[in-house]
């Protein structure tokens, strides 16, 4: 069964599964080079179909992770007479332009404006040619989040609590589910007056950053400050015993502008900005982080007790917060804590496809996700052609892992471009910038000369999985950088470039099965230095998506202070290194 999931909105993406196997999963931003791109993901769709060696008419199912499409039609079109053409409302006119971008005039006139409008008429009919037998599934936003996590968790025969938490999707901000016997059951949903994601977004905007994009910065800054309890009361919803006890009216959080795009803005950001100045940026960030942890605990822990389970599954953008995830793990109340690694909205294309598959085949047993390498890859022949076309000096090596490890020992910055690109926002050893973790100053070198970003933002360690207990307190096998851990005290001075100011790190535990070439690199570095850890950060600069194509890797390499670029088996050095 061929199922294509398509997410249209911010963090647009597409994912293809064939007979339950994940074939491709990629965000549109990687092709357009627009961070968090919200345009229709036609490039992602084309890649998915190519990866599956099929065309759109061979799709058995199109899965769309929203039910709001139909609501939008009924909100802005009075059937059979549409409201939209008569209104001067800016929001309505903006939505009309949005719809016009993906619908042909014929579809608009013949189907949307008719009383026979199908409840499953997709926005995707214009750019995709589907067969008449292709089924179309609309999957509620948070159910798609839940499915992305449940059907990749590897949990069988046990009951698990599932929590999805983000800004808002299909008018839901947080949701509680039960996962048992491969079935997802809804237990509780909270509307947008309950959104902790919007609170965090408002706080991010108050700091002068972009909400729904720069929340990482606030999380990274928080450990530099001291939380100020009660300082932010009145700006967030409050929970107790697993339920909402105080709503927060966020007002209109977004509107459709004249260009046919949604513009997000939180009214609380102006008021919160005054508190940023009163408290200081570090203390403000620390209090925001304290609030999100406190309120998430007030939701999750009572529900764990109600469900009498020690297995927790999470997805949604709020669970990209690695400090929250660490606090949950350290409660001692969990035997299993699975966070879908592509937890933001880019991950719900896959979630909707998985839900469609396991709804169709409920007796099929899902497989635990072992890697996220589901994007484009390039052959040595393709790369060599690009290098020759650029007139670059290069060399071919049989063992790039060995070569890279030796460069790192010499404290060079290495661009590392290998195999299939990762899905999600974290570089996991295929589109990475690497450096030795042994010198504290390497953190500043990378922030200032390579990434061009704020000094307080930490870097992640990649460690071979057999050594995780040597470096981290109370670790679990964590291959996707979804949780931070305390670094073992005696190791903090040994690998200072990957230890944050609070003594934590957000590691990727690398197994040879998941990524043999990256594993061999780290292992060889360990043999040479006695530390089986390297510094791993995403292959991009601030404000840009992770590189997807070799040409983008070359541009980033020459635009920054990287010393060496290794693309598959080819090595390119900066002129200063060429002797």
Regions found by a protein language model. Name each.
Residues 1-4:
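Extreme N-terminal starter segment of soluble prokaryotic enzymes
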Residues 286-312:
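Phosphate/ATP-binding catalytic cores across multiple sugar-kinase/actin-like superfamilies
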Residues 55-123, 147-148:
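Short beta-strand-loop/turn "lid" adjacent to the catalytic site in phosphate-handling enzymes
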Residues 109-114, 136-139, 274, 278-294, ...:
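Short acidic-aromatic active-site loops that bind/stabilize oxyanions
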Residues 7-25, 32-35, 78, 85-86, ...:
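Flexible beta->alpha loop and helix N-cap segments adjacent to enzyme active/binding sites
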């Amino acid at each position: 069964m061929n199922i294509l999931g398509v997410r249209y909105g911010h963090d647009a993406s597409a994912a293809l599964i064939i007979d339950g196997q994940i074939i491709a999963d990629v965000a549109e931003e990687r092709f357009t080079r627009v961070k968090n791109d919200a345009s229709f993901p036609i490039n992602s769709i084309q890649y998915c179909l190519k990866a599956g060696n099929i065309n759109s008419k061979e799709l058995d199912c199109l899965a769309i992770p929203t039910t709001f499409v139909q609501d939008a039609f009924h909100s802005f079109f009075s059937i059979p007479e549409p409201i939209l053409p008569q209104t001067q409302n800016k929001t309505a006119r903006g939505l009309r332009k949005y719809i016009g971008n993906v619908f042909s005039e014929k579809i608009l006139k013949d189907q949307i404006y008719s009383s026979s409008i199908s409840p499953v008429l997709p926005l995707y009919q214009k750019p995709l040619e589907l067969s008449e037998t292709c089924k179309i599934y609309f999957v509620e936003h948070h159910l798609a989040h839940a499915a992305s996590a449940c059907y990749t968790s590897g949990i069988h025969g046990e009951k698990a609590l599932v929590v999805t938490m983000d800004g808002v999707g299909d008018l839901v901000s947080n949701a509680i589910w039960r996962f048992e016997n491969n079935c997802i059951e809804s237990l509780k949903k909270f509307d947008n007056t309950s959104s902790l994601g919007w609170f965090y977004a408002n706080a991010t905007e108050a700091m002068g950053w972009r909400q729904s994009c720069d929340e990482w910065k606030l999380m990274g800054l928080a450990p530099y400050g001291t939380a100020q309890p009660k300082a932010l009361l009145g700006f967030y919803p409050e929970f107790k015993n697993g339920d909402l006890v105080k709503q927060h009216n966020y007002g209109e959080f977004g509107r459709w502008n004249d260009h046919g795009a949604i513009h997000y803005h939180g009214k609380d950001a102006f008021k919160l900005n005054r508190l940023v100045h009163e408290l200081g940026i570090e203390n403000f960030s620390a209090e925001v982080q304290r609030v999100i942890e406190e309120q998430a605990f007030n939701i999750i822990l009572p529900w764990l007790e109600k469900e009498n389970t020690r297995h927790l599954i999470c997805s949604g953008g709020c669970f990209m917060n690695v400090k929250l995830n660490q606090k949950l793990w350290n409660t001692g109340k969990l035997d299993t804590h699975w966070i879908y690694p592509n937890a933001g909205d880019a991950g719900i294309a896959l979630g909707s496809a998985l839900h469609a598959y396991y709804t169709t085949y409920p007796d099929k047993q899902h497989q635990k996700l072992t890697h996220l390498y589901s994007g484009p890859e390039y052959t040595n022949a393709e790369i060599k052609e690009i290098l020759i076309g650029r007139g670059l000096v290069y060399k071919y090596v049989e063992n790039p892992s060995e070569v890279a490890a030796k460069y790192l020992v010499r404290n060079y910055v290495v661009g590392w471009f290998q195999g299939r690109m990762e899905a999600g926002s974290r570089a996991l050893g295929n589109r990475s910038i690497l450096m030795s973790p042994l010198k504290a100053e390497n953190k500043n070198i990378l922030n200032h000369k390579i990434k061009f970003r704020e000094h307080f933002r930490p870097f992640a360690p990649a460690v071979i999985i057999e050594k995780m207990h040597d470096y981290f307190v109370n670790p679990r096998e964590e291959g996707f950088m979804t949780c931070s851990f305390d670094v073992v005290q005696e190791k903090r001075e040994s690998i200072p470039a990957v230890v944050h100011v609070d003594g934590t790190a957000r590691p990727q535990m690398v197994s040879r099965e998941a990524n043999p070439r990256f594993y061999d690199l780290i292992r060889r570095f360990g043999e040479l230095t006695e530390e089986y850890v390297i510094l791993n950060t995403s292959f991009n600069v601030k404000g840009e998506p992770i590189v997807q194509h070799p040409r983008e890797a070359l541009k980033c390499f020459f635009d920054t202070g990287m010393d060496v670029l290794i693309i598959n088996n080819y090595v390119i050095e900066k002129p200063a290194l060429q002797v």
